[in-house]
Amino acid sequence: MKVGFIGLGIMGKPMSKNLLKAGYSLVVADRNPEAIADVIAAGAETASTAKAIAEQCDVIITMLPNSPHVKEVALGENGIIEGAKPGTVLIDMSSIAPLASREISEALKAKGIDMLDAPVSGGEPKAIDGTLSVMVGGDKAIFDKYYDLMKAMAGSVVHTGEIGAGNVTKLANQVIVALNIAAMSEALTLATKAGVNPDLVYQAIRGGLAGSTVLDAKAPMVMDRNFKPGFRIDLHIKDLANALDTSHGVGAQLPLTAAVMEMMQALRADGLGTADHSALACYYEKLAKVEVTR
């Protein structure tokens, strides 16, 4: 099976390398020539356009920043739709709006091209070690056919429903992650402002009910002042905006999500849009006039 992979960013590059390690033949594309060179050195081939990739691959994976990027690559000039033969499958592993997934799928289906929306969670560390969580929407038979391909990059791969369901699930995930980071930031800022060592507070609570994967991943980053992006604030704002747009469409209320998105937008205005989303703690630190350190 020859696999196309478009998008070799923070997540896409290690994901593509895991496919190579699993023995898949890979053809890649990205706007960053250094990323392409790195993956070629690991054993991949390259092509200049999405159309060129689609002409030679049975299945194409996209890992791109947002809905417009996926639409352009899938449906635009020199896009997948221009090169793919009937029966080709697009697995979009980007985090985009559920409505966009459905629109892209409909356009591709008219040309005999199937699609799964399969966003991931776990950030760069899990992309590197191949233990991502993948949440997938689309035809169950297509999911079953390409389960092993997705599993080569993941610890868990779960079918969540029809096309778009994968991205609804990812939005739910992103809401939980954002609110967890906000709660952690409030708690550690409280401890610091009250004169208690936040590292000791973290060690004391991590084994109890307040403990979580988010707490263990992000509290050390805050205390070490390490905001190297595993997942950028800019991208989390995008996800929360998509969650709010989706909630408006279905009549759900997300007041905490709206509040945290406002905080992240304030941080972006302060120049932290490209920082890791754990830098949400900086919003609370600024208000309290403290810095959360070990």
Curated annotation (Swiss-Prot):
The cross-references to InterPro entries, in alphabetical order and at most eight, read: 3-OH-isobutyrate_DH-rel_CS, 6-PGluconate_DH-like_C_sf, 6PGD_dom2, 6PGDH_NADP-bd, HIBADH-like_NADP-bd, HIBADH-related, NAD(P)-bd_dom_sf, Tartro_sem_red
| Keywords assigned by UniProt, alphabetized | NAD, Oxidoreductase
Protein residues bound to NAD(+): 4-18, 95, 238
Enumerate the catalysed reactions: (R)-glycerate + NADP(+) = 2-hydroxy-3-oxopropanoate + NADPH + H(+); (R)-glycerate + NAD(+) = 2-hydroxy-3-oxopropanoate + NADH + H(+)
Q: What class of enzyme is it?
A: oxidoreductase
Show the HAMAP family listed in the entry.
Tartronate_sem_reduc
Q: What is this protein called?
A: 2-hydroxy-3-oxopropionate reductase
The species this protein was found in? Escherichia coli (strain K12)
Gene (UniProt): garR
